[in-house]
A protein has these predicted regions:
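Short, low-complexity cationic-aromatic patches
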Residues: 58-63, 136
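Double-stranded beta-helix
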Residues: 96, 100-141
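A short, N-terminal "cap"/entry segment at the start of jelly-roll beta-barrel domains
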Residues: 1-42, 123-141
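Short glycine/proline-enriched turns and hinge-like loops at secondary-structure junctions
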Residues: 41-43, 60-62, 79-81, 99-102
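Glycine- and acidic-residue-biased ligand/ion/polar-headgroup-sensing regions
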Residues: 52, 61-76
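Conserved metal-binding segment of the jelly-roll/cupin
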Residues: 51, 80-102, 109-112
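Conserved short histidine dyad/triad with adjacent acidic residue
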Residues: 30-35, 43-60, 83, 90-94
Length: 141
């Protein structure tokens, strides 16, 4: 394999992106990198901001993901997690509903599952023009 076959590093500053509507109420995102037709295996990687009281329903994914809590406290299952906590969800996984009384900020990285090959979804989840009711969301993927 020659150097021509390798891709260059990319850099993006969070201030260069605007907050976008995430599919769950009380949540906004800045995905600095995300899948596109030209780059279908790119990760969803960026920030998710939560308003106090924000949560989302139990659901499942075929991709893998890592969350790093930067601000706030999040109840996930029986445990309360705060700043400095990193959570890893292998593929496939069920995602217990995180909820926050304080509001908060997380670094999100969702990537193609090494076991399932499932890819994260950007369009219609992290960049919504208008949020749908939770009951209308697909929680099976």
């Amino acid at each position: 394999m020659s150097n021509r076959d390798h891709q260059p590093m990319e850099a993006m500053h969070a201030d260069d992106r605007s907050w976008e509507t995430l599919r769950w109420p009380g949540q906004e995102s800045k995905m600095l990198f995300h899948p596109s037709p030209e780059r279908p295996t790119a990760p969803n990687a960026g920030l998710v901001r939560y308003e106090p009281g924000s949560h989302h329903p139990f659901h499942k994914h075929d991709f893998a993901q890592v969350w790093y809590i930067l601000e706030g406290e999040f109840q996930i299952g029986e445990a309360l997690h705060g700043p400095g906590t990193m959570l890893f969800y292998p593929d496939p996984h069920f995602e217990a509903p995180p909820s926050t009384r304080t509001g908060g900020l997380m670094l999100f990285v969702q990537y193609q599952g090494p076991t399932t090959g499932g890819r994260p979804i950007y369009d219609g989840r992290f960049n919504m023009k208008e949020r749908r009711a939770i009951a209308e969301e697909n929680v099976e993927r």
